Amino acid sequence: ALRAAHAPGVVLDADALTAFEDAPETLFEMLHAGCILTPHAGEFARLFPDIAETLNAPATKGPACSRVDATRAAAERAGCVVLLKGPDTVIAAPDGSCSIHAAHYDRAAPWLATAGSGDVLAGLVTGMMARGLGPAQAAEAAAWLHVEAARRFGPGLIAEDLPETMPQVLRALGV
């Protein structure tokens, strides 16, 4: 029960999001501030079709809609943190606060674009929440660790390599 009086933090990814593609408002009614949605671009478009349309539209009148704008609008509508996955992962809370975690330039990790890596990210977010971080902070920490593990492993990465590399990342941080 997502809306229970003392509902725990809940991370929704993949099929948990796709299950509501025909009725996203039903999902939004059940969410609370302790929830996190972790869609990739396709899942985002199914949950927030109007926002995705604006995001993908050319800027013919006025300024373009950025991934930051779109993620903020989605978080406000859903009433919870939204982590929009991509090479520039955007994390937004319903209050409008936002962070971006890039996996390009000096933190390039293009090999993260592999099947299952988003599932690992959702697991990392869940683990961070279990350790007591709030939803936005858990999403931010998990996104950073996700990229660091991928960078440490390097090319040829498959999703299963990410959790196996995490102890090295944490040791390097002194954790």
Model features per residue range: what roles?
Residues M129-A142, A150-G156:
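Phosphate-handling active-site elements
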Residues A1-H104:
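Glycine-rich phosphate/dinucleotide-binding loop and adjoining beta-alpha-beta core of small-molecule
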